[in-house]
């Protein structure tokens, strides 16, 4: 995956403003729209050390994450006092396993993850520059079982007003990337003038948006 050194340096220097200390409230609020069943296999790309993994593991028997940074994965298990089984895979990846959770370290595009029934993407698509998104979405489609669903959280703002990441990925681009899939907007949270992205970054508008994407 390109820009690997960028993300390795972010984790190494603890510059992880993108990390949320708690479960993203949009996950429990909108997860039911994906019609989840306990036996559904869930994939979380570019998962970091997200608390969302813990929440998902209480709802599903199999949750797989993929994360480039070994620092992030080790921190996740240490902070939750989990002792995972660690298995090296082909010199390129490691698999960390604990109960319902499995996390692969290494490049998402080559990680040997299982086929998934539901993908949860809160911070993956928006972390990638535009020239990588088509390849990323192609990989998601490859990993999604027939009838699979994606719960996508994305951002929408004038890209020329702020350099990403996180990048702006508006509805029009989502529809292009997922042509042939059913795309449903579940929520648009439009920021007011007090939001840090507007008050401090000077953006003219900023919204966090939730989409359900379904294979047809």
UniProtKB/Swiss-Prot annotation:
GO terms for cellular component: cytoplasm. It holds the Pfam family TPMT. It catalyses: S-adenosyl-L-methionine + a thiopurine = S-adenosyl-L-homocysteine + a thiopurine S-methylether. It is found in: Cytoplasm. Belongs to the class I-like SAM-binding methyltransferase superfamily. TPMT family. Its EC number is 2.1.1.67. It is an enzyme of class 2 (transferase). One of its GO terms (biological process) is response to metal ion. InterPro entries: SAM-dependent_MTases_sf (IPR029063), Thiopur_S-MeTfrase_Se/Te_detox (IPR022474), Thiopurine_S-MeTrfase (IPR025835), TPMT (IPR008854). GO terms for molecular function: thiopurine S-methyltransferase activity. S-adenosyl-L-methionine binds at residues 11, 46, 67, 122. It comes from Vibrio parahaemolyticus serotype O3:K6 (strain RIMD 2210633). Keywords: Cytoplasm, Methyltransferase, S-adenosyl-L-methionine, Transferase. NCBIfam families: PRK13255.1 (NF009732), TMPT_Se_Te (TIGR03840). This is Thiopurine S-methyltransferase.
């Amino acid at each position: 995956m390109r820009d690997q050194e960028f993300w390795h340096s972010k984790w190494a220097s603890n510059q992880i403003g993108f990390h949320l200390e708690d479960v993203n409230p949009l996950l429990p609020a909108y997860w039911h729209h994906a019609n989840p069943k306990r036996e559904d296999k869930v994939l979380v790309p570019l998962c970091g050390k997200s608390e969302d993994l813990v929440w998902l593991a209480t709802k599903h028997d199999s949750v797989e994450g993929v994360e480039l940074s070994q620092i992030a994965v080790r921190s996740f298990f240490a902070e939750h006092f989990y002792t995972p089984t660690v298995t090296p895979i082909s010199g390129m990846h490691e698999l960390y396993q604990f109960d319902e959770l499995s996390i692969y370290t290494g490049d998402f595009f080559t990680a040997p993850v299982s086929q998934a029934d539901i993908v949860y993407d809160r911070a993956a698509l928006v972390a990638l520059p535009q020239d990588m998104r088509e390849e990323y979405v192609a990989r998601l489609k490859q990993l999604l079982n027939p009838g699979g669903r994606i719960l996508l959280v994305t951002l929408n703002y004038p890209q020329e007003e702020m350099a990403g990441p996180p990048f702006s990925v508006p509805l029009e681009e989502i529809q292009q990337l997922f042509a042939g899939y059913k795309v449903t907007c579940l929520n648009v949270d439009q920021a007011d003038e007090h939001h840090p992205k507007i008050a401090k970054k000077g953006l003219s508008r900023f919204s966090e948006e939730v989409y359900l994407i379904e294979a047809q």
